[in-house]
């Protein structure tokens, strides 16, 4: 879908929202369209008229407009889009949203070791189709706030039942996802980091026949042999090496490294006498003992080198959920900059922007992904948009065919004053959207100039 066709996108995502009145649904679609068109800007700055501004604020203040109803429409749209893909990765991760605005902070909970910080905890699940490198959409998202009175009382949390702990979020996400996807769930592989290495969660996934790849955090006991899980690599089946692209993060530079893969079936046991868990264990590590090492647990059967490498490739895609949270929180949708008067109003906007952020991520990812960067840029830019961008950035005669997505992504970033100082070829969120806004100003100027050719 062309990026500037925001209304079609918004109608596809939110057009089925059940808000008790069709006029509210239409207003939601209009608001989402404006927020997508001017990603990162406020309601006032993104709306096209004062009537739109007033309508948007009435919608956000309406107690009959439930955040879950807004999200439900988006999840339904994602489930509908998922039906056409033979394999899907459910990329999961948690984050916190930090809101410093004084009017709403008292309704929020603690989020960090800083007792003054206030916000929401969030657990998100993105569906991604690895076969075509396509971002399908957001299929699940939970929001909650920690009680301020429980700050610093970790020992009390350990005594709670599993269903009342934050760690239950992983199983809860799988339950919700299975309800929404139905038969499609059998094509889904959940991909989670070390926080999901929870006995109850692994047991649940296996008992429900759900597929997963989880990075192990705990050096668990083995049922069929003495010793523990992390001492197994010397006795595993070798599966060759794999080139891993380590993305730039914080002060860590982007790099490529050779990872050596080995695998075997394992049975993990618990000291309490519960039945062991039968899984496949894959070890992926650098030759340097101090280098990176992934201990992966999966429900998938691995019988050869190709299958082992495929599992490692699935886990590599997990970083996309971290990129999604960046697109949502800071560089793209800038959800943490919201200034709403109540928590309910805040959650309505947070929910809408959660889906806008998926759209932001999909644009950047298609432009930098090796699988899609050579596709035509007309999948995201209209002919007028890419031609104006070409004239502005290249200053040459227009090519006979549209340039690739990689060119479009980098050209938008350069228009936003991006300089590839780290030599990664991966522009950040802010420069892409600065470039996008400048391009839209160019398009508007071009159309106004064209209109002068008509009689007034």
What would you call each of these model-derived segments?
Residues 1-106, 114-121, 126-456:
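Single, function-defining residue in the core of a domain
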